[in-house]
Amino acid sequence: MKETSALIDKACRNLNIDSLNGMQKQMLETATRPNDIILLSPTGSGKTLAFLLPVLSRISPKIAGVQALVIVPSRELALQIDNVLRKIAAGIKIVCCYGGHSVREESKSLAVAPALIVGTPGRIADHIRRGRIVLETLDTLVLDEFDKCLALGFQDEMQEIIAPLKNVKKKILTSATDSESLPAFTDLKKPVKLNFLGSRKDNETTPTDRLSLYRIDSPIKDKLETLLALLHNLKPGLTLIFCNQRESVDRVRQFLTDRGIIAEAFHGGMEQADRERALCKFRNHSSYICISTDLA
């Protein structure tokens, strides 16, 4: 308990938060039981820290080998979790694996026996096939945003990774949607479901609570001009524009660029270095507009 308290104090300090929220506290408490966990929570609720604290509390310096595996649906989420881990888990060897990243660099890092691996299903499965990732010592498995992993078509890769894992002691599955049934390969043991979808206290808020939603109907041929008028009239700060196709992202960006508006494109057809460069510009406010596909 003393080690867990120290972990919590360090996490709060390094992440600049005063204390854990209700969901994070309940996750820590529930994780002490032998049951697997299904965590249902909305975006922006502190879910990442909620599952990372129990994961880190189970890692032992006496064990050589991979003790925890976190599977996520996207490169950006893998990098986001890796960034949090770097702040709260100093001294623990961590490797982040995802498509578009150098396989050679990942292979070198994996050869030094990491305790924790974060990655996307396709890249993790590939490393396992090639013998670069061995999960004989795995204690904890996290399936983060599991619903999105399935929606993106990763069921085969996830089954390939998870089905052979018979000795995992703790599985944590997170999702933004509630489902009565799960694929058999998840093989959860007497799972406890923690449902935080729409159950926040009156004084608890998330980033989405600060958003206002408006709808503007426009003929397809006038959409770009309507968007341009909105940007000129509203003069917004940081702005995310979502499109449903990569080609649409590129078309909208070119339209705005031709009219003197700086904007970054962000989609799965771009090289990883270009994606990271676009995000960096958006984060440091050198570009105030980012145009993205909803699954990028």
List each language-model region with its residue ranges.
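Conserved pre-motif I regulatory segment
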Residues: 1-40
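Post-DEXD/H (motif II) to motif III coupling segment of the RecA-like Helicase ATP-binding lobe
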Residues: 134-204
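P-loop (Walker A) phosphate-binding loop of NTP-binding proteins
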Residues: 40-43, 73, 244
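Conserved interdomain hinge at the start of the Helicase C-terminal
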Residues: 209-258
